[in-house]
Amino acid sequence: MSRYRGPRFKKIRRLGALPGLTRKTPKSGSNLKKKFHSGKKEQYRIRLQEKQKLRFHYGLTERQLLRYVHIAGKAKRSTGQVLLQLLEMRLDNILFRLGMASTIPEARQLVNHRHILVNRRIVDIPSFRCKPRDIITTKDNQRSKCLVQNSIASSDPGKLPKHLTIDTLQYKGLVKKILDRKWVGLKINELLVVEY
């Protein structure tokens, strides 16, 4: 299955706020939920919604998510926490969390168009797995800096997670350590995703 390119707001109304997909948020008393979601929720439906929430937030295909679940299952620690750490340490997500891009699809495009350097090397793979002490910068040209500058200016510096630091003047970010569960930017029960 290919990446989802359809209307984003429909997904947000159905699954709740997904900050990685778009900045828009649904109204609290949405009539759509009353129309379609009546009665008792089945266990399968709950698990499917959690999986879809994770998929659409990080912009993954079904196959990519299954691959991450498989890798997390081989780890000796909790599968759900390892899964979230793998997803949060992706380059496109790190750019989004640093504020260098307003959404994950925008961060993905920055990486694909070769505007981003990791440890002074161009990386054009959005799923590149960052490690602690990785330095993420923009290219030296004016166009790259302008794209990132607009996003940094509109981002909230108070939302920066503890495992990341950013120097807004040099357009440089640093991954200090691996992410803790409490700093994940999405309200999700990762165990339901693993069980699905």
UniProtKB/Swiss-Prot annotation:
One of its GO terms (cellular component) is small ribosomal subunit. Keywords: Chloroplast, Plastid, Ribonucleoprotein, Ribosomal protein, RNA-binding, rRNA-binding. One of its GO terms (biological process) is translation. SUPFAM superfamilies: Alpha-L RNA-binding motif (SSF55174). Its main location: plastid. It holds the Pfam family S4. It is found in: Plastid, Chloroplast. Belongs to the universal ribosomal protein uS4 family. This is Small ribosomal subunit protein uS4c. It comes from Dendrocalamus giganteus.
